[in-house]
């Protein structure tokens, strides 16, 4: 079984081309493949197939809004095997993979996701490095809530970017004090507010057009970056300063991306890196439940 490995600001993925939708992505198999000791290691899996093929195979009950049968669809799975609606870094890597392998020849096209079709612009793409802008669509305010991180309570805003986020801006945080926080344990949150779990971002306020952010992703743990999380963070940071539009550079442990918000919609621009390709041993894969 062929695979590629890539990352967007060190949020890393195993890419599995599966045009005929024959790969059984059971939760235990996904978890084993993403395990950094017994598998390839990754924050998630990106299955590459056309939306129509996934619908015909029963993976999708229906085509999400803005997605046609002929669109390439990012079937995304978290490291624990759970299905996720959307992954901004994943879309960049997915689009880069399509262009670098020749599966897609256009620089502008739509990537399907469970959160709807996501138009992308591939600014550059070769066998290893790419730069991609993703139209992340509508950003929705869910109201205020709070997270408990490292024994401290941080107030934040619930934000829907195709998946749920709780973005907490703290005016007293510096890059150094943010780095010192312990995100080993999952942050506490209100399960009544977020019944299906939530991705939690903690960040500094805007300074010279930029913020520093860390993220704990549901089903994964702390990651080096989270694309939808950077959009949520930029949204929360702008609102903290009384604005609802603007451009914010978001610095995460894995690098930097640029988020632009206007009219309630967001775009995300950042790098993608393809680092390896190879073949999974069939006996190992088939031996997994």
Curated annotation (Swiss-Prot):
Active site, renumbered: 87 (proton donor), 226 (proton acceptor)
Subcellular location: Cytoplasm
Domain of life the protein comes from: Bacteria
InterPro entries attached to this UniProt entry: DAP_epimerase_AS, DAP_epimerase_DapF
GO cellular component terms attached to this protein's record: cytosol
Keyword DNA damage among record annotations: no
Main location: cytoplasm
HAMAP family on file: DAP_epimerase
Name used for this protein in its record: Diaminopimelate epimerase
Organism: Rhodococcus opacus (strain B4)
Gene name linked to the record: dapF
């Amino acid at each position: 079984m062929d695979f590629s490995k890539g990352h967007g600001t060190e949020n890393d993925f195993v890419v599995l081309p599966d045009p005929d939708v024959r790969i059984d992505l059971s939760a235990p198999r996904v978890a084993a493949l993403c395990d950094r000791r017994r598998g390839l290691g990754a924050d998630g899996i990106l299955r590459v197939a056309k939306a129509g093929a996934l619908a015909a195979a029963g993976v999708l009950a229906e085509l999400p809004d803005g997605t046609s049968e002929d669109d390439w669809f990012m079937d995304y799975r978290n490291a624990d095997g759970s299905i996720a609606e959307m992954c901004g870094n994943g879309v960049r890597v997915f689009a880069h993979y399509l262009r670098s392998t020749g599966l897609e020849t256009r620089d502008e096209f739509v990537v399907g996701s469970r959160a709807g079709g996501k138009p992308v612009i591939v600014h550059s793409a070769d066998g290893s490095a790419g730069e991609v802008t993703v139209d992340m669509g509508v950003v929705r305010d869910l109201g205020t809530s709070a997270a408990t991180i490292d024994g401290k309570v941080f107030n934040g805003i619930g934000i829907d970017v195709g998946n749920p986020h709780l973005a907490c801006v703290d005016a007293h945080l510096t890059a150094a004090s943010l780095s010192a926080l312990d995100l080993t344990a999952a942050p506490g949150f209100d399960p009544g507010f977020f019944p299906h779990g939530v991705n939690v971002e903690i960040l500094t306020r805007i300074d010279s057009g930029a913020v520093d952010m860390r993220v704990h992703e549901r089903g994964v743990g702390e990651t080096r970056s989270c694309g939808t999380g950077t959009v949520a963070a930029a949204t929360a940071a702008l609102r903290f300063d009384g604005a609802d539009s603007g451009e914010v550079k978001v610095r995460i442990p894995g690098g930097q991306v640029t988020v632009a918000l206007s009219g309630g919609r967001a775009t995300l621009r950042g790098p993608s890196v393809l680092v390896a390709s190879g073949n999974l041993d069939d006996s190992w894969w088939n031996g997994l439940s």
